[in-house]
């Protein structure tokens, strides 16, 4: 598989300008400094419910996620990234605050992502690099679900105890992980 040429940040639901919300804009600026590498952080359609039927086509036709793309998905964006990788080849998934169920939440249920079983083997077959960031003190996601994602996808897991739902304004570890994918092994 060819080396990645871009990263795409797929945000969590909730709205707000992706360029200025949390760490999204900070990471985009950091990755844009890499010569020959592009990072997209666009506002998603249907930002509150984040419906699968709207987000996955947008990821394909507007964000052009393909085998040279690193998809960085946060929260609902991580869920969209996993569903996307069930049917599309991508270079890598970086999942931040990923989970496996609708958590009993009506809005999550309405998104459509949780209406069927996960196709873990297809995700792994379509994506050779899967990295996950999770925190045991996430106020929205039980650790059990985050750990299940890591186990099912054989993800390289960066486990924290103090990051909550990763809503900070900087994310140095994520930048390092992307850079490590772009550096040929010596």
UniProtKB/Swiss-Prot annotation:
Domain of life (superkingdom): Eukaryota
What is known about its subunit structure? Interacts with RB1; the interaction disrupts RB1 binding to E2F1. Interacts with RBL1 and RBL2.
Q: Name one GO biological process term.
A: type II pneumocyte differentiation
* InterPro entries registered for this protein in UniProt: AB_hydrolase_fold, Hydrolase_RBBP9/YdeN, RBBP9
Q: What keywords appear on the UniProt entry?
A: Hydrolase
Originating organism:
Rattus norvegicus
Extract the Pfam families matched here: Ser_hydrolase (PF06821)
Q: What is its EC number?
A: 3.1.-.-
**Is Protease included in the keywords of this UniProt record?**
no
Q: Which family is annotated? A: Belongs to the RBBP9 family.
**Gene symbol?**
Rbbp9
What residues make up the catalytic site?
A: 75 (charge relay system), 138 (charge relay system), 165 (charge relay system)
GO molecular function term, any single one: serine hydrolase activity
Report the catalytic activity.
valacyclovir + H2O = acyclovir + L-valine + H(+)
- Give, as one word, the top-level EC class: hydrolase
Region (Involved in binding to RB1), start-end ranges? 63-67
Disulfide cross-links: none
**This protein's name:** Serine hydrolase RBBP9
Q: Where does tissue-level expression of this protein occur?
A: Highly expressed in the spleen, testis and kidney. Also found in the heart, liver, lung and brain.
Q: What does this protein do?
A: Serine hydrolase. Catalyzes the hydrolytic activation of amino acid ester of the antiviral prodrug valacyclovir to its corresponding active drug, acyclovir. May negatively regulate basal or autocrine TGF-beta signaling by suppressing SMAD2-SMAD3 phosphorylation. May play a role in the transformation process due to its capacity to confer resistance to the growth-inhibitory effects of TGF-beta through interaction with RB1 and the subsequent displacement of E2F1.
